[in-house]
Every structure is written in C-alpha cells, then in structure tokens.
Amino acid sequence: MKVTEEIYFYPWESYTQNNCNSILISGEVKALVDRGHKAPFPQLAAQLKKDGVDPHQLDLIINTHSHPDHFEASQDLAQHGVRVAMHPEGEEYLRKMGPMFSRATGQDAPQIQIDLHLVEGELELGSKKILIYHTPGHSPGSVCLYLPAEKVLISGDLIFAQGVGRFDFPGGSGAELKKSIERMSELDVEVVLPGHGGIISGRDMVERNFSLIREFYFPMLE
C-alpha cells in the first residue's frame, strides 16, 4: 500500500503473509522497517518486487525492536550484504535475553551482526531525514521513526489503532511505555504506521487515538 511517494506499508494480513507490519522507505537509499519472521518473507519479497524493489538490493533494515516477530528474518538479508540497524539497548537485549525469548516462542535465536546503532537524533537516508526516538516500554531498545516532511510516525509496537504494546515481556515497563507514548503524542503527526494492525490516518484520528489511549490504557500503565 502506497502511503506517500516514497513510503509503502505492507500490513500483516495472515500468518502466511507476514507476522508484523513492514514499511519500505524508498528513494535514494532504500530501507525496510521490521522485516518480521523468515518463514513468510517470500510473500513480502513478492510485494516489494511488485513495487520495484529487489529485497537483496535494499540498503538498510531498520528494526524498531529486537523481538523475533519483527527482527528474526533480518539475518537472511544480512547475508546478502544488507546492513542491519537497531538501538544499542535492542542489541544488548538480543544478546542477553534473545536466546531465552526465542526458545520460549519455539524459535532459534538469530545470529547476526548489527551494523548501525540507532541513537536518538537524526538519521539521513540520502536526502531524506528521519528522526529516531528511543521509546522504551514494550522493550528496552524500542524506537519510533518520525519523518517530519511527511508527518509520518512509524511507531513499532509502542501504539496501535485503539491499543498499546504489551509491557509484560522481559524488559517491559508500563511506566516507561506511558512516558514514551506521551513523547510521541507531542509530534506533528498525520499518519501513524504501527507494528501491527491498521494505519491511523488524518490528524484528527491520530489525536483521537492518543486521547483514547490516555483514557483507557494509561490507568493500567501506572
């Protein structure tokens, strides 16, 4: 699904399609956000090719966090020379907690080198500027990506349409999740692309979604 001229959204539609939403940031430098599990990746690869992108020619994989359902398949593209990025606390979590987390979900822990640490601040993809925000709560190394020119927020598993990310996994924190959500609510956003579920589109809908989260979810995050 084309969101803007250079942003494409690939929703999680079924377990044979993928297991999380993936986002392509196109342009001079091509980055795929959250590749998901490796088993269903051929379906996502086919969609990318329809949009004119060879997955093996991507420049960067950006991981919003290091839970297997968003990150696992990154290792396959890395073997083709695609660089892999995540927050340094995400890498630490991957090394220390990743094997246990993967075993608990019946998977093998990915063995992969992280080429780029996503620290808070500006990330340049060619002429495109992305602001990286460290947004812990769902996991210690979670990040959100904000594209100010397009007013697009890529929220990972921080917020969804009428929902928030789980905070009961190892390293999760309801209090940190709440702080991170409040930070993101202050941005000038017209489109939210979450890690699961549908797009939140339109400034009014984005603001209403944050209001709903404050009313119904914040009391549980104390």
Please place each PLM-identified region on the residue numbering.
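Conserved beta-strand hairpin/beta-sheet module of binuclear metal-dependent hydrolase folds
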Residues: 1-51, 144-156
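Short Pro/Gly-enriched beta-strand edge/turn motifs at strand-loop
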Residues: 3-8, 101-105, 127-128
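Short beta-strand or tight-loop elements
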Residues: 5-6, 114, 121, 126-128, ...
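Short polar/acidic secondary-structure junctions
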Residues: 14-15, 123, 136-137
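Short, charged, surface-exposed secondary-structure boundary motifs
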Residues: 19, 94-98, 163
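Metallo-beta-lactamase
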Residues: 30, 37-39, 100, 129-221
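Active-site HxH/HxHxD metal-binding segment of metal-dependent hydrolases
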Residues: 39-123, 212-215, 219
